[in-house]
Amino acid sequence: MTHLPKPRALLGTLAFFVPLMLPTIPAASQDKAATPEKVPVADDVPSAQELSVWIMTYYQRPEPDKFGQRVRQLSARGMLKGNRPEFFTMFLGRVMHAHPERIAGWMEAWKDLPADELEILRNGIWNSQTDAGKQWLRDHKYAELADKPAPPLIAGGPMVLEPYHLDLMWEWFFATGAKEPVLLIVDKFPLNPQDPGDDELPPVPNRQGVDRPTFLRATIGRTAVWSAASLAARHDKLLEHLRAIRTDPRLPPRGKLWLDRVIQIAERDREKNAKT
């Protein structure tokens, strides 16, 4: 059987995923200056690998008190540079969604970051879909972004699926540990054109002689399977969600077969890792 590739960059965001309870911050709309969170930039900034682990395990140990500082550390390490559409905005947005009262203070503390990084942070605010976030955007002359329709992944609206959307789904899970993004990922398993066979993973899609939609569907299906299997070997919460989803009678036959394969790979790798 073909062995599962070791964790690596999925498509975009995961490229850097190497294997504060403050008082409510008054909104600027209340004619009060937002209270900036005091965010020291440590001389000894954690390594890119350490920050990647922090992102991937944030849901296990949420750190709203340190979130502002961590974002500055990501900036210092060059890890807030977007390399695909909607880069990092889902992770930011889901953390901000959990702490809307802090958005104004965080943004005040981040105001000296580079313009391209501030744009990512503003898009994170939009992704939070919170009243406090929308108000901050309006107060700072970004009303058009504030009034933009909610992200389809969050709102459940129609969308043209692209490979980078898997990155957004994983960002969502890393930020929250929620089941919903895992359901969205499992929903992509049936995009694989074949049921599981002798090889462990779906075949690498062949671009030649295939139209773009067909190629993208196969690429998304394969990436969904191997990323889920790889991550479930190390994330208890993810494996727990996958096992729960496995009992859903509405799963399409091909999706169920690939889910069985993902769970099998994850359990095998866990057992192997326990022996080493």
Question: What is each model feature region?
Answer:
Residues 1-2, 120:
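Juxtamembrane helix-loop transition sites at the ends of transmembrane segments
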Residues 2-14:
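Bacterial N-terminal signal peptides that target proteins for export
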Residues 12-23:
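Bacterial N-terminal signal peptides
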Residues 19, 26, 40-42:
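N-terminal non-cleavable signal-anchor helices
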Residues 21-33:
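Signal peptide processing junction and immediate N-terminal pro/mature segment
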Residues 30-276:
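Non-catalytic all-alpha helical scaffold/repeat segments
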